[in-house]
Amino acid sequence: MRSSFSKCKVNTCNPSNCLEVDILIVGGGASGIYSAWRLSQTYPNKKVLVIEEKSYLGGRLESVYFGNEKIYAEVGGMRTFPSIDLYVTAVIKKLKLQSIPVPYIEPDNIAYVKNTRLTVEATSIGPSSNPEKQKLIQLYKIPPDEQNISTNDIIYAAAVRAAPTFPEDWRTVYDYPELNNETFSEMFSEQGVSANTQQVFEVFSGYSFFISQRLAASTGIRENISISGENNQHFVVGGYSSIVFGMTDETFCNPNYQLFLNTSIKKITPSNSPNGLHTSILVDTLTGLPITIKSESIILSVPKDSLNRIVAPITPNTIETMNSLTDWRAFKAFLLVDQTTYQLISMNGHMKGRGISDLPARQVWAYSGNPPCVLIYCDNAYADFWKKYINDEINNCFPKFHDPCINKPLVSELKRQIGIIYSVDPSKIVVNKILYKYWYAGAYFSKPSDIPKLFEEVRTPLGPEYSVYLVGSDISVSQGWVDGALNTADNLLVKYYGVTSILDENRLY
């Protein structure tokens, strides 16, 4: 990540002064910077201040260069699906950035489950007489009526029966009240999908939240559209966070738009009069000194845990919405390995994308061949397994690669599990550098609830009478995805600030 921006500098504030701005934006992640960027294009003369609690921008986008000029180590948000993520695609186009397709779910990749080595293709091939499929049927005791159908086809057909309109427009899944108010697993059971096949689906997805986390059915359908591998995944050339840096460079060259890093918000006192100014108390996190900001409106681009720390008259509906979200934990470890190790794990370069297992090392990616890099990725209970190996001092800083000796127990356990999955002697796995991070709340997902109603009401967390707004992927129809963050910000700017949607703008060209 760049330590400074190429065309502008970060401003500092004299805490003895009370600043007055038109718009205060809290949060330097994708939705916060997007909001400032789009406002600067429509209202260059407005005075806008963006604050970010950390010493760097990007929010849950953390891209680290490791020698590959195209693909970075994506410690947070990792990939985009252009046919689904329309807002991300539009931003990439407008910034003149590039994205490239990267292998994801390849049929010959390893699937190590129940102490048995299969290929990922085992869930899709048929008929049941196929040796790979026979193993899968025996391991998971798949019922006869589901044995000759691919797991993805069973899951897709069940979703179509529950939400007939979703193949034409996946956003319509949220129009079905029953899908918002029941779990993904309950929906499958109602549609006749066995618990055995549901288990196969979750295990082979490489994730551990579809069934075990009790997601709302509508949310589960949406997530599977991306995660299923039916659509091509792309990585942003130069790192996913480069979209934030690109928007930043274009925004803060304008002296009316200011950016304060190392600045958190502690309190919001809304104005009692319709045209009055809201008062926000900020704190310089380096000095502890308070800063008072008065603004006509506030855009909060913050996740659930950050919103909960702000002292403000938050409405009961907002509290209800926040309580309806469940946290999603994640763990990633990027290993820079020698060429021999990479050849072993990638099966001499034949394996691309990721293999899966039911071990805590749920996903193992042949991430980069030059330089050789392997990624271990897992979530929720499996991520929690790795938490005991985490050094909090390292985990809480912007990630970087370290000598493996810095955490020998972690490296040893990673090598042990990789060895089991790929039938490789752990002593032959050579790790030269390691980068790792445990995300306590990498995203938030909806539990069964009245999702559309709650998401609409939470847009104005202090009530509709106040010009204080909330954006971010947590309250979007694409939870956990950058596109969700941009979608909420774009909708807000259109509705309350008269900014043209970037999607409509793209249609003009």
From Swiss-Prot:
Major subcellular location class: virion
Subcellular location: Virion
GO molecular function: oxidoreductase activity
Protein's organism: Acanthamoeba polyphaga mimivirus
Gene3D superfamilies: FAD/NAD(P)-binding domain (3.50.50.60)
Origin superkingdom: Viruses
InterPro entries in alphabetical order: Amino_oxidase (IPR002937), FAD/NAD-bd_sf (IPR036188)
A GO cellular component entry from the record: virion component
Keywords, alphabetical: Virion
Name this polypeptide is given: Uncharacterized protein R188
